[in-house]
Design a protein with these regions (language model features):
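Ubiquitin-like/PB1-type beta-grasp interaction modules and other compact soluble beta-rich domains
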Residues: 1-64
Length: 65
């Protein structure tokens, strides 16, 4: 299926947000995941299904001083 990830069209066979992020080397626990304009929180990442045309973004949280 085709989705938009970080603003770019991407082809994937992953069926969940977590499975797709794993193919991209992204650990959802280290940031914030947004699917179709809504935040996907915590454990919901593993249970949330992807669909054709989904818009997915992942933001890494960086802190320091």
């Amino acid at each position: 299926m085709k989705i938009r990830y970080q603003g770019k069209e991407t082809e994937t066979g992953a069926d969940t947000v977590a499975a797709f992020l794993a193919t991209q080397g992204v650990d959802a626990a280290e940031g914030v995941v947004e699917l179709d304009g809504e935040i996907v929180a915590g454990d919901a990442v593993a249970a949330t299904s992807l669909h054709e045309g989904a818009e997915l973004n992942a933001f890494r949280i960086v802190a320091g001083g």
